[in-house]
Each structure stands twice: as C-alpha cells, then as structure tokens.
Amino acid sequence: MTGSTIAPTTDYRNTTATGLKSALNLPQVHAFVNDWASLGMWWFSIALMFVCLIIMWLICCLKRRRARPPIYRPIIVLNPHNEKIHRLDGLKPCSLLLQYD
C-alpha cells in the first residue's frame, strides 16, 4: 500500500466554552461564542431569558383559560302555584326550603 493517506479526524475533545461540538470549521461562530462576555452581550442573554419566560407564562395562562369548564349558572324560576323551584336548564325541580311567614 503505497501512497495511502489517512483522512483528517475532528478532535471532539477540544470544545468551545459552551460545550458545543461541531464538525464544521466556522471561525466567526467560534469567536462569537467564546468572546460573548467581551462583546458586551451579557445583557442580551438575560433579556432573552426573560422574553422566553414571559412567552412560556403567557402560553400557560392561555392553555389554562381554554381548559377551564364554562361557569355554570342555572336559570331558576319560582312558581307561585306549587311552591317548587322550576329550573329552566332541564334539571329536576327541588323543593323550596325557605318558609315565609
């Protein structure tokens, strides 16, 4: 075997400060990620975190509001003839427990 070459391998042990691994050689991204603090972008990380928290909070509120059952308000009509409460929502009538003098 004359003239055989070994393909270059990527050393995954040499990772960036974030722990991300990539087979691509992107020096701009590598410099941006490693120099995040020196670029004055620390405030961007905090702002992005708060934006994500607000979005997640809104999603949870909207899901909970949609999942709530509708408020049940029975329609009750007093019938003067037989002292029973007649319900217009289809449920059984119940006896009037209040005694009037």
Curated annotation (Swiss-Prot):
It is found in: Host nucleus membrane. N-glycosylated and probably also O-glycosylated. GO terms for cellular component: host cell nuclear membrane; membrane. The chain crosses the membrane at residues 41-62. It comes from the Viruses. Signal peptide: none annotated. It is a single-pass membrane protein. Glycans are attached at N14. Its main location: host cell. Keywords: Early protein, Glycoprotein, Host membrane, Host nucleus, Membrane, Transmembrane, Transmembrane helix. Pfam families: Hum_adeno_E3A (PF05393). Belongs to the adenoviridae E3A-1 family. This is Early E3A 11.6 kDa glycoprotein.
